């Protein structure tokens, strides 16, 4: 999914997690490992998380509260959003 306005900080608390980031024009993979690093994800980026180890835990910090209308859950809708 992606967000229209929300900024997120993804931190791997335990294990390993592959985060795929797609801006609609290209894709980049980031491996997050046990508190070693975090990933700042701006609005308008489609992300997918793949848990690489059993028991992996991802902590997500956001700059705003939950707002369902901020979510883009359909990839085709996301491509239209980034084309604007």
Sequence positions of predicted segments:
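Short, surface-exposed beta-edge/turn micro-motifs
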Residues: 6-9, 36, 55-56
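Double-stranded beta-helix
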Residues: 48-84
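Short acidic-glycine-tyrosine-enriched beta hairpin
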Residues: 23-43
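Short, conserved beta-strand element in jelly-roll/cupin
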Residues: 4-19
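Flexible, glycine-rich phosphate/dinucleotide-binding loops
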Residues: 18, 26, 67
């Amino acid at each position: 999914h992606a967000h229209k306005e929300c900024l997120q900080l993804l931190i791997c608390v335990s294990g390993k997690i592959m985060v795929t980031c797609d801006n609609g024009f290209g894709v980049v993979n980031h491996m997050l490992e046990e508190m070693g690093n975090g990933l700042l994800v701006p609005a308008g980026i489609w992300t997918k998380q793949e848990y690489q180890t059993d028991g992996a835990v991802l902590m997500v910090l956001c700059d705003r509260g939950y707002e369902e209308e901020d979510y883009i859950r359909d990839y085709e809708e996301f491509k239209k959003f980034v084309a604007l």
